[in-house]
Amino acid sequence: MSHQPLSCLTEKGDSPCETPGNGPSNMVHPSLDTFTPEELLQQMKELLVENHQLKEAMKLNNQAMKGRFEELSAWTEKQKEERLLFEMQSKEVKERLKALTHENERLKEELGKFKEKSEKPLEDLTGGYRYPRALEEEVEKLKTQVEQEVEHLKIQVMRLRAEKADLLGIVSELQLKLNSGGSSEDSFVEIRMTEGETEGAMKEMKNCPTPTRTDPISLSNCTEDARSCAEFEELTVSQLLLCLREGNQKVERLEVALREAKERISDFEKKANGHSSTEKQTARRADREKEDKGQESVGSEVETLSIQVTSLFKELQEAHTKLSEAELMKKRLQEKCQALERKNSATPSELNEKQELVYSNKKLELQVESMRSEIKMEQAKTEEEKSRLATLQATHNKLLQEHNKALKTIEELTKQQAEKVDKMLLQELSEKLELAEQALASKQLQMDEMKQTLAKQEEDLETMAVLRAQMEVYCSDFHAERAAREKIHEEKEQLALQLAILLKENNDIEEGGSRQSLMEMQCRHGARTSDSDQQTYLFQRGAEDRSWQHGQQPRSIPIHSCPKCGEVLPDIDTLQIHVMDCII
C-alpha cells in the first residue's frame, strides 16, 4: 500500500479532486485509482495521530520556553538582589568605619587628657583598679562553687528521676496484682492525705502485726484477709504517690533555685563589669564609695546565696530520707505480696492466674528494661549532640572571626576595585542578555515554523474532509451502479429464458409445418414412390435434415455473451464475473 499520492497532495495543499460530482470512477484523479477506502481511512488516522503529536510537541516546547524564561527572570532578579545586598553591606561597612574612626578619635582625646594629668591621680586610679580585681576573683570563686553545686544538684535530680521511674514500675505491678485479686473495690484510686495523716498511717502500719495463716477451708476468713490486704496495699500506694509528688515538688523547687542563682550570678558579673568600666573611665573618690556600697551588697547577696544553697542541701537530704522510707515500704509490700501469693496458692485456677500474672510481670519488666535501654541510648545521643553542638559553636566562632576578617578585606578591595567590578559585571550581564535575546529569537523562529506546519496540517485536514465527501459520493455511485447492474442481469436472464421458450415454440411450429409439407409432398409424389419402405426412408431422411437445420439455428445465436465487449462465455457464473470486471 503506497502513501505517495496523498503525501504529495498534503505537501502542495491542493484539493485531490479536480472534477467533483457524481460520476463514474474513470473521471476521478488517477492517483486515487490505486487506493481503497480502508487505506484512505488508515492514512486519515495516521495524519490525525501526527497532528496530535505535533500539537503535544508544540505544547511541550512552549512549556520549556516558559520555564527557561522564568529561570532567566529569576536569575536576573537574584542578581539584582545580590547587587542590593552588596550595596547595603558596603553602606553598613562604611558606617561602621565612620563610627570606629569617631571612637578612635574620642579615645585619643581621652588619652591626651589622661597624659596631661598629674601622677597622683594616676596612682589613685591604680589603687582603685585593685578593688574590682578582687571583686572579680571573688565572683569567679563563687561562680565555680555554684557550678559545682549545680552539677551536684543535677546528679541528685537524675537519681531522683530514676528512683521515681522505679517507684512507678512498682506501683504498676501492685495495680496489676490488685486487679487480678478479683475484688471490686481494688481499682487504683489516688488518695490525697495531709502530712499528719500520712505519719499516722505509717505508725499504724508499723504497729500492726502480720496476718497469720488460717485454714484453707474457711473461705470467709480468706476473703476478709484479702480485703484487708487490698486496703493496706491501697494505703501504701497512696503513700508512695505522696512521696513521689513531694520529691517532684522538691526537684522543681531546686531547679527554680538554681535558675535564680544563675540569674544572680549573671547580674553580679554584669555589675562587676559595669564597676570595672566606670573605674577605668573615672578616677574619683565618689565612685570608690559607690563601689564600696556595691561590694557590701555583693557580700550580702553572696551570703544569701550560700544560705539558699545550704537550704537546698537540707531539702535534698530530706528527699533522700523519704526515698529510703519509700524503699523500706516497697520491701514490706513485696514481702506481703509474697505472703498473699503463698496463701492464694491452693486452687489450680488461682495458680494459673498467678502464672499469668508472673508472665505479665516478666513482660512488663522486659518492657521496662527495654525502655531504660532506650532512655540510655537517647541520653547518649543527647550527649553526642551536645558535644557536636559544642564543636559546632567553636567552629561557628572561628567562622565568625574569619568572616570579620573577610569583611575587612572585602572593604579594602571594594574601595580599590569598585569601578572595575562594576564594569566587568556590566559586560557579563550584557553578554548574557545578548545570548538570551539570541535564544529567544531562535525560539521565535521555531515557533513561526511550527505555526506554518500547523497551518499546512489544517489545510491537509480540509483536503481530507473533501476526500472523505468524495469517497462517500463514489461509494453511493458504486452501490447505485451495482444495483442497476444486478437489475440488468436479472432482466437479461429473464430475456434469455423467454428466448429459450420462444425458440422451443418456434422449433415445434417449424417441425409441425415441415411434417405437413412432407405429407403434401408425399401425396403429390405418391405415384413415384410406391414402396412404403422407401416412403418411410424419405420421411425419416427429411426429418433428420430438418432436425439438423433446426439444430444449427439456435447455435448461431449465442445465449452467454457480454453486452459490452460481445465475448461469448460458457456459463452464467463466468459471464457475471466477466461483466463485473469489464464494467469496473
From Swiss-Prot:
Instruction: Indicate which residues form the motif UBAN.
Output: 477-482
Compositional bias (Basic and acidic residues): 267-295
Short motif (LIR): ranges: 186-191
Q: Which domain of life is it from?
A: Eukaryota
Location comes to: Cytoplasm, Perinuclear region; Golgi apparatus; Golgi apparatus, trans-Golgi network; Cytoplasmic vesicle, Autophagosome
- Alphabetized GO MF terms: identical protein binding; K63-linked polyubiquitin modification-dependent protein binding; protein-macromolecule adaptor activity; zinc ion binding
Q: Please give a single GO biological process term from the UniProt record.
A: Golgi ribbon formation
Which parts of this chain are annotated as the region Interaction with Rab8? 58-219
Name the segments for region: Interaction with MYO6: 415-524
Tell me the leader sequence span. Answer: none
Q: Where is this region: Interaction with HD?
A: 414-584
Q: Where are the zinc fingers (CCHC NOA-type)?
A: 554-584
* Classification via PROSITE patterns: ZF_CCHC_NOA
Question: GO CC terms for this protein?
Answer: autophagosome; cytosol; Golgi apparatus; perinuclear region of cytoplasm; recycling endosome; trans-Golgi network
Q: Where is this region: Disordered?
A: 1-32, 267-302
Tell me more from the record. OPTN E59K transgenic mice exhibit profound gliosis in the retina.
Functionally, this protein is described as follows: Plays an important role in the maintenance of the Golgi complex, in membrane trafficking, in exocytosis, through its interaction with myosin VI and Rab8. Links myosin VI to the Golgi complex and plays an important role in Golgi ribbon formation. Plays a role in the activation of innate immune response during viral infection. Mechanistically, recruits TBK1 at the Golgi apparatus, promoting its trans-phosphorylation after RLR or TLR3 stimulation. In turn, activated TBK1 phosphorylates its downstream partner IRF3 to produce IFN-beta. Plays a neuroprotective role in the eye and optic nerve.
Q: How does it assemble?
A: Self-associates. Interacts with HD, GTF3A, TRAF3, TBK1 and MYO6. Interacts (via UBAN) with ubiquitinated TFRC. Interacts with active GTP-bound Rab8 (RAB8A and/or RAB8B). Interacts with TBC1D17. Binds to linear ubiquitin chains. Interacts with LC3 family members MAP1LC3A, MAP1LC3B, GABARAP, GABARAPL1 and GABARAPL2; OPTN phosphorylation increases the association (at least with MAP1LC3B). Interacts with RAB12; the interaction may be indirect. Interacts with TBK1; this interaction leads to the Golgi localization of TBK1 and its subsequent activation.
Q: What's this protein's name?
A: Optineurin
Recorded source organism is: Mus musculus (Mouse)
Q: What gene does this protein come from? A: Optn
